[in-house]
Design a protein with these regions (language model features):
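Extended, highly charged
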Residues: 2-199
Length: 199
């Protein structure tokens, strides 16, 4: 079942946001989210659906998609799975405070300048002091798994295409620390190679 989210109100809901949940709620408020109750990825239904969206709306016009339940390797797995959350023109600019109705689809230079001007209005970008809060009040780490409790295969990551060599974390944010080389932060497509191994 596919349902296009209805525009909840006409107010501009702009960032910055406290969490990915708040960001997705703002996108949904603008009617730019399609919710899918369940889909069979063993038959590559999600892959086909996303390609059809891109064909119809283009790379910068396709809405975000939230899948509530998905079939992976013969089993139905609860989501949500979020796809294309940053793909639609204007969403990233909206996240830094540019109202979505000021974003012009297809006018990338205009949109870039609009977002850049908004960043400049914010002044110098300086490091934010670390604030320590009690673990019970943390907005993340609702579930903490350690050592053998960790099983990446429990998460609804999918094999996106038939030619893939397995399931992948697509556009995952990866932070690594090397004792000699230091820290690296990047966005990568990472293959899941086991319960506690990605590469």
């Amino acid at each position: 079942m596919v349902k296009k989210a209805l525009k909840k109100n006409s107010n501009n809901v702009t960032g910055p946001y406290d969490s990915l949940r708040h960001y997705m709620e703002a996108i949904e408020t603008h009617g730019n989210v399609i919710r899918i109750k369940e889909i069979d990825q063993d038959a590559y239904e999600l892959t086909g659906f996303i390609y059809k969206l891109l064909d119809k709306h283009g790379w910068l016009g396709a809405p975000s998609v939230i899948v509530e339940k998905i079939k992976i390797s013969g089993e139905w797995v609860d989501g949500p799975i979020i796809i294309n959350q940053y793909g639609m023109a204007g969403h990233e600019a909206m996240a830094i405070g540019v109202p979505l109705d000021e974003i012009k689809k297809g006018e990338h230079l205009h949109n870039y300048k609009k977002a850049l001007n908004k960043m400049m209005e914010m002044g110098d970008i300086t490091p934010i002091e670390t604030t320590e809060i009690d673990k019970a009040d943390a907005p993340s780490k609702d579930v903490i798994l350690k050592e053998d409790e960790i099983n990446i295969l429990d998460f609804p990551f999918i094999q996106t295409n038939p030619g893939d060599n397995g399931r992948f974390i697509n556009t995952g944010n990866l932070i690594t620390v090397d004792p000699e080389q230091g820290r690296n932060v990047g966005t990568y497509r990472m293959q899941i190679k086991g319960p506690r191994k990605i590469g």
